């Protein structure tokens, strides 16, 4: 006869889940959606009830949640997360793809985590101008887990942390794949895209106006000999 009394509900079972927010950031083509899918499937194998939400205006892959390499998963399309709140309350794990496009991403994730849900968000951290994308970075201090993935630079094959737009559109929200964007490293980000005119009309990827030689001159201000001259005397 066993002397061990096990509880009816084990601590790790779905009915005893503790809310949390997991954030997966990175540029395009860094594997954010693939990682989101992997994490959700991991919970599905453990018999957790899961829901994936995708941005409704992204119609490239029909109504399914899809990675760039065409792996798919059933998803619920939405433009505002509050519109699918009732469906989200009925599951244990919520996956959100393209989180940067949802204006209510912060409030929704915090409310769901406080309700005991595990919320996994995949999102771009920056725009093609390397500025914060929507409200997504406001989710970072609320999250239990945050990772930033890198891609491979599509121009020089080094590590890529940024997204570079190939076209001339000015608006932030332009949905597309490799036909409109490249993942790039720091050096390639500032290179003029092929087909774009040089000069003041091509400012998207330019840090400061001026000639290329001026950047080199600026670096010389911080040459080792100058730094030594500014050091306090012993």
UniProtKB/Swiss-Prot annotation:
Binding-site residues, ATP: 26-33, 58-60, 97-100
BP-aspect Gene Ontology terms: DNA synthesis involved in mitotic DNA replication; nucleobase-containing compound metabolic process; protein homotetramerization; thymidine biosynthetic process; thymidine metabolic process
Binding sites annotated in the UniProt record for substrate: 128, 172-176, 181
Positions of the catalytic residues: 98 (proton acceptor)
Positions of post-translational Phosphoserine modification: 2, 13, 231
Annotated phenotype, changing residue 13 to A: Loss of phosphorylation. Constant expression during cell cycle. No effect on ATP-induced tetramerization
Gene Ontology molecular function terms on file: ATP binding; identical protein binding; thymidine kinase activity; zinc ion binding
Signal sequence, start to end: none
N-acetylserine: residues bearing it: 2
Effect of residue 203 to A: Resistant to degradation in the mitotic exit phase
Catalyzed reactions per annotation: thymidine + ATP = dTMP + ADP + H(+)
Result for mutant: residue 163 to S: 50-fold higher KM for thymidine
Enzyme class: transferase
Post-translational modification remark: Phosphorylated on Ser-13 in mitosis. Phosphorylation of Ser-13 by CDK1 during mitosis reduces homotetramerization and catalytic efficiency when DNA replication is complete and intracellular TK1 is still present at a high level. Polyubiquitinated. Postmitosis, ubiquitination leads to proteasomal degradation. The KEN box sequence located at the C-terminal region targets for degradation by the anaphase promoting complex (APC/C) activated and rate-limited by FZR1.
Record motif KEN box, residues: 203-205
InterPro entries given in the database record: P-loop_NTPase, Thymidine_kinase, Thymidine_kinase_CS
EC number: 2.7.1.21
Protein's cellular compartments: Cytoplasm
Effect of residue 194 to P: No effect on phosphorylation
Main function: Cell-cycle-regulated enzyme of importance in nucleotide metabolism. Catalyzes the first enzymatic step in the salvage pathway converting thymidine into thymidine monophosphate. Transcriptional regulation limits expression to the S phase of the cell cycle and transient expression coincides with the oscillation in the intracellular dTTP concentration. Also important for the activation of anticancer and antiviral nucleoside analog prodrugs such as 1-b-d-arabinofuranosylcytosine (AraC) and 3c-azido-3c-deoxythymidine (AZT).
UniProt similarity note: Belongs to the thymidine kinase family.
Name of the protein in its database record: Thymidine kinase, cytosolic
Upper lineage: Eukaryota, Metazoa, Chordata, Craniata, Vertebrata
């Amino acid at each position: 006869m066993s002397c061990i009394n096990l509880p009816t509900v084990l601590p790790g079972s779905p009915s005893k889940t503790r809310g949390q927010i997991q954030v997966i950031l990175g540029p395009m083509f860094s594997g954010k959606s693939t990682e989101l899918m992997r994490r959700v499937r991991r919970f599905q194998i453990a018999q957790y009830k899961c829901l994936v939400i995708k941005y409704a205006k992204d119609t490239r892959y029909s109504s399914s949640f899809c990675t760039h390499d065409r792996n798919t998963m059933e998803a619920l399309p939405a433009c505002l997360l509050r519109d699918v709140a009732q469906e989200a309350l009925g599951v244990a794990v919520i996956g959100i793809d393209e989180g940067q496009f949802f204006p209510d991403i912060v409030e929704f994730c915090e409310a769901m985590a406080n309700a005991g849900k595990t919320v996994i968000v995949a999102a771009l951290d920056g725009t093609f101008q390397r500025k914060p994308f929507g409200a997504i970075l406001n989710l970072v201090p609320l999250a239990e887990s945050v990772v930033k993935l890198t891609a491979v630079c599509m121009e020089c094959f080094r590590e890529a942390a940024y997204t570079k737009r190939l076209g001339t559109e000015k608006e932030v929200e332009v949905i597309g794949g490799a036909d409109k964007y490249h993942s790039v490293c720091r050096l390639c980000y500032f290179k003029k895209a092929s087909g774009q005119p040089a000069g003041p009309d091509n400012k998207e990827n330019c840090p400061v106006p001026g000639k290329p030689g001026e950047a080199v001159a600026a670096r010389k201000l911080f040459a080792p000999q100058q730094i030594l001259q500014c050091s306090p005397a012993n």
